[in-house]
From Swiss-Prot:
Belongs to the EPSP synthase family. MurA subfamily. The keyword Flavoprotein does not apply. Pfam families: EPSP_synthase. Cell wall formation. Adds enolpyruvyl to UDP-N-acetylglucosamine. Pathway: Cell wall biogenesis; peptidoglycan biosynthesis. This is UDP-N-acetylglucosamine 1-carboxyvinyltransferase. Phosphoenolpyruvate binds at K22, N23. Transmembrane segments: none annotated. GO terms for molecular function: UDP-N-acetylglucosamine 1-carboxyvinyltransferase activity. Its EC number is 2.5.1.7. Keywords: Cell cycle, Cell division, Cell shape, Cell wall biogenesis/degradation, Cytoplasm, Peptidoglycan synthesis, Pyruvate, Transferase. It catalyses: phosphoenolpyruvate + UDP-N-acetyl-alpha-D-glucosamine = UDP-N-acetyl-3-O-(1-carboxyvinyl)-alpha-D-glucosamine + phosphate.
């Protein structure tokens, strides 16, 4: 099993190109099931979850071609199987996103209940409740969601803000008969990206980027070409890496308007940030200052950046609180950071961080995707060698992270065994 060996190597300097967002690419790929035409996606990150989604769509009969760099062609005209099996779905929660489009287009779908990151309960009840409101008959048998029926437009008020639920119901509504009003929608950039692609495919959607979207059902959708929005979490991870080591790095193919609260927190920590339409520059010349974090739904501070800022705060000047309001059980990186010399205590959904001057390298285990990133960041500033094990989590969300960090001066290598 691969692992990363990391040693501090001074400030980082240079340029990094940000990949497309995995959390946008996966629902966009599933949207290919809505049409018999060809959906051409650009700026797709070549990640494990993307490859799993490719296999899932191909298993359903879709024709999926890729240049294995950043482009995909998905043709749903050959779909001949409406079942998404456990073997593929078990590794990735986003697999549930085939449910809405498959049911809407074919009148039936069978999808195994998903797996994915071990960071607490992330139920799909809002997905199912919304589809039932639109006329679907749904039962859960032997670990599978079995749905059938012709979908009709209606008002769906989600009980909680859910990104995946919003995406699933939005895709389903594009082919439902009549008008669907989706209330309490997630407004993350990845949801907006999906909606904008669906409009290119012929969907009629108003209220994009707001908590209420109105969808006029279309008889059918067609193919289109779409570029995946840049990954704001990958960008934020690299910015935290520079903030902890010092240096100056420019991120290309970035989307600063999608991550303003993260940039504000970096400035609060002592970084100098500049940004244009598609680039971000960070200049860090001092020990970071501790910053309080409270995760909330977009446009607030993203839960997917909490662990990275925990690593930054671990060596910051002063003390702070980190409050996690989105997921329970998302402090699994704390014991590993403490093994490296951090001074972090937790109480419920709050972590109390007292910054230390330096961390010490250690053998640490990644427990989920963003926890992995926090350990990499910590290793870049620790005295001695850090070995991050179980990095298959990291590969689910970061494309060539060791090569990208290495290109700006980090001492980091992937080793097998």
């Amino acid at each position: 099993m691969d692992k990363l060996k990391i040693s501090a190597n001074g400030p980082l300097n240079g340029e990094i190109t940000v990949s497309g967002a995995k959390n946008a690419a996966l629902p966009l790929m599933c949207a290919g099931l809505l049409t018999s035409g060809t959906l051409r996606l650009k700026n797709v990150p070549m990640l494990a979850d993307v490859k799993t989604t490719q296999k899932l769509l191909q298993g359903m009969g879709a024709r999926v071609l890729t240049d294995n760099i950043s482009e995909f062609e998905i043709n749903g005209g050959t779909v001949n199987n409406t079942c998404a099996p456990y073997e593929l779905v078990r590794t990735m929660r986003a697999s549930i996103l085939v449910l809405g489009p498959t049911l809407a287009r074919f009148g039936e779908a069978q999808v195994s209940l998903p797996g994915g990151c071990a960071i607490g309960s992330r139920p799909v009840d809002q997905h199912l409740k919304g589809l039932e409101a639109m006329g679907a008959e749904i039962v859960i048998e032997h670990g599978y969601v079995k749905a059938k029926g012709k979908l009709k437009g209606t008002r769906v008020a989600m009980d909680v803000v859910t990104v995946g639920g919003t995406e699933n119901l939005l895709m389903a509504a594009t082919l439902a008969e009549g008008t669907t009003v989706l209330e309490n929608c997630a407004i993350e950039p990845e949801v907006v990206d999906l909606a904008e692609c669906l409009v290119k495919m012929g969907a009629k959607i108003s209220g994009i980027g707001t908590s209420t979207m109105v969808v006029e059902g279309a008889g059918e959708l067609h193919g289109c070409e779409h570029s995946v929005v840049p990954d704001r979490i990958e960008a934020g991870t690299f910015l935290c890496a520079v903030a902890i080591t010092g240096g100056r790095v420019v991120l290309r193919n970035a989307a600063p308007k999608t991550m303003e609260v993260v940039l504000d927190k970096l400035v609060e920590a002592g970084a100098v940030i500049e940004a244009g339409d598609d680039w971000i520059a960070i200049d860090m010349r001092q020990r970071p200052k501790a910053v309080d974090i409270r995760t909330v739904v977009h446009p607030g501070f993203p839960t997917d950046m909490q662990a990275q800022f925990m690593a930054l705060n671990a060596v910051a000047e002063g003390s702070c609180r980190v409050v996690e309001t989105i997921f329970e059980n998302r402090f699994m990186h704390v014991p590993e950071l403490n093994r490296m010399g951090a001074n972090i205590t937790t109480e419920g959904n709050t972590a109390f961080v007292q910054g230390v001057e330096q961390l010490s390298g250690a053998v640490v285990k990644a427990t989920d995707l963003r926890a992995s990133a926090s350990l990499v960041i910590a290793g870049l500033a620790a005295r001695g060698e850090t070995v991050v094990e179980q990095i298959y989590h990291l590969d689910r969300g970061y494309e060539n992270i060791e090569k990208k960090l290495g290109s700006v001066g980090a001492k980091i290598e992937r080793v097998s065994g």
